[in-house]
Design a protein with these regions (language model features):
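Non-heme Fe(II)/2-oxoglutarate
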Residues: 1-70
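Catalytic core of non-heme Fe(II) oxygenases with the double-stranded beta-helix
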Residues: 56-161
Length: 161
């Protein structure tokens, strides 16, 4: 199992801009959305492309967790999983960016046998097919999540954004 952690990933201005967007959401989350754009135009995807093969990249899905719990799961094509009654297809990798972490008790990211402590401005990129979850927590824990794909997942059967 592989993962990479990059601390202080964004410069302060970029981090502040992302934090402002989260503040506007209040307690809501960014809904899961599909985008088809060059990965070189997205700092998170560009970083992931340094360690994962993006030669067949088609687009990415993004969403957020704004102080929300995450039960154990594997990032997968949910539409394909439902349609095939349990078969799995995975993204290129999974990307978690900690936008804001304050006064946190608990809330560690569990990657099978590894535990990662959340920290503001921390980027975590990990291999596809890994069970992961978030321990119960109190405090502020805001994350921005991205899954890049080599195809458009069956989950997204509407128009491309």
């Amino acid at each position: 199992m592989g993962f990479r952690i990059v601390d202080n990933f964004l410069n302060q201005k970029s981090l502040d801009n992302l934090s402002k967007k989260f503040n506007l959401l209040k307690k809501d989350n960014i809904p899961v959305m599909w985008f088809e754009e060059d990965y070189n135009n997205n700092v998170f995807l560009k970083e992931a492309s340094k360690i994962y093969d993006f030669s067949k990249y088609k687009g990415f899905e993004q969403w957020s967790h704004n102080n929300t719990q995450c039960d154990p799961h594997i990032d997968k094509d949910e539409g394909y999983f439902k349609k095939t009654l349990g078969k799995l297809k995975f993204p290129i990798c999974s990307i978690i960016f900690y936008v804001e972490v304050k006064n946190l008790k608990g809330g560690q990211l569990k990657l099978e046998d590894d535990t990662i402590t959340p920290k503001s401005n921390r980027l975590v990129i990990f291999d596809p097919g890994i069970y992961h979850s978030v321990e119960k927590f109190k405090g502020t824990r805001r994350t921005y999540l991205i899954n890049p794909w080599n195809y458009k997942p069956k989950t997204f059967n509407y128009e491309t954004i």
